[in-house]
Amino acid sequence: DLEALSKGLKEAGAGRLCLYGPPGTGKTEFCHWLAKKLERPLIMKKASDLLNCYVGGTEHNIAAAFEEAKRENAVLLFDEIDSFLQDRRTANHSWEVTQVNEFLTQMESYEGYLVATTNLLDLMDNACLRRFDLKAKLEYMTDDQAEEMYRRLAQKWKFSVGNEVNNLRKIRNLSP
């Protein structure tokens, strides 16, 4: 129940979520919705915002992202976090380890709302995964969910539902 989750997070005043699942299932969109429910701005960071070719640059950018979110009292979203937070045991370079260590350090001391999204949960560092309060898998809609969404949209947009609703069951990997 997403409403209950947002209410619980709001009451707690902080939380660390990891949303995972196939592409197009609404992970990033959920973060926008959650920020609105929490009445906070959303700060979204992608690997391109954080990765830096200079020694210590990525670590600096990670720390700056957390500081910005703290200053703005925002929900901090790391989108597609697997692109820079991979398992340290498979690291080929020392900087891969230090950027994960920096993220873990920042994550431990952060007292706000943190959300990470990934399509590749199995590639992420285990120490990082343990630090999330909740890991939630978002899947494609079931046939019943797709039909329910279609019916709700029909009601909202005032059109009648006919036999075309049965065609939804033929479409795979629908997302909201």
Where are these regions (language model features)?
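The conserved phosphate-sensing helix
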Residues: 171-176
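Walker A/P-loop NTP-binding motif of AAA+ ATPase domains
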Residues: 1-169
